[in-house]
């Protein structure tokens, strides 16, 4: 199940109001949400249009949820930049995994010689 963090549209005509939600990527825009993370009111005064729980956003990003382009922009505009923190954590984990894989490959290659041909005779 691939998860998306995206906007769920509410409000009336010419008065949009959005909820920032975690949904299965196959759900329709206004479909069932797994969790509501916050709100986005594009018509509200500057500085009050976005409010969401950064800790829960980071929780879902660490578990592989992909933000939509608009939600990515909103997350980056918030202080603390949740996306940068998650990306640096992922890079740190990936580099440690690569180091472990490299050490394993080196230990295996030193332990056993590679056979030259299946029958033991050269072709």
Swiss-Prot record:
Alphabetical keyword list: Ribonucleoprotein, Ribosomal protein
MF terms (GO), sorted A to Z: structural constituent of ribosome
UniProt keyword Phosphoprotein present: no
Domain of life: Bacteria
UniProt cross-references to InterPro entries, sorted A to Z: Ribosomal_bS16, Ribosomal_bS16_dom_sf
An individual GO BP term: translation
UniProt entry tagged with the keyword Cytoplasm: no
A matching Pfam family: Ribosomal_S16
Gene Ontology CC: one annotated term: cytoplasm
Alphabetized PANTHER family for the sequence: 30S RIBOSOMAL PROTEIN S16, SMALL RIBOSOMAL SUBUNIT PROTEIN BS16M
Family recorded in the similarity comment: Belongs to the bacterial ribosomal protein bS16 family.
NCBIfam families: S16
HAMAP family: Ribosomal_bS16 (MF_00385)
Protein name: Small ribosomal subunit protein bS16
Top-level taxonomy: Bacteria, Pseudomonadati, Spirochaetota, Spirochaetia, Spirochaetales
């Amino acid at each position: 199940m691939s998860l998306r963090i995206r906007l769920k549209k509410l409000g009336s005509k010419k008065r949009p109001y959005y909820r920032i939600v975690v949904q299965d990527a196959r759900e329709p825009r206004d479909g069932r949400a797994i969790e509501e993370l916050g709100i986005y009111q594009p018509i509200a005064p500057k500085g009050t249009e976005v409010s969401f729980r950064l800790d829960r956003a980071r929780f879902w990003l660490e578990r592989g949820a992909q933000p939509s382009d608009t939600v990515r922009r909103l997350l980056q505009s918030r202080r603390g930049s949740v996306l940068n923190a998650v990306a640096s954590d992922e890079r740190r984990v990936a580099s440690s995994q690569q180091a472990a894989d490299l050490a394993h490959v080196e230990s295996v290659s030193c332990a056993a010689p590679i056979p030259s041909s299946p029958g033991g005779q050269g072709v």
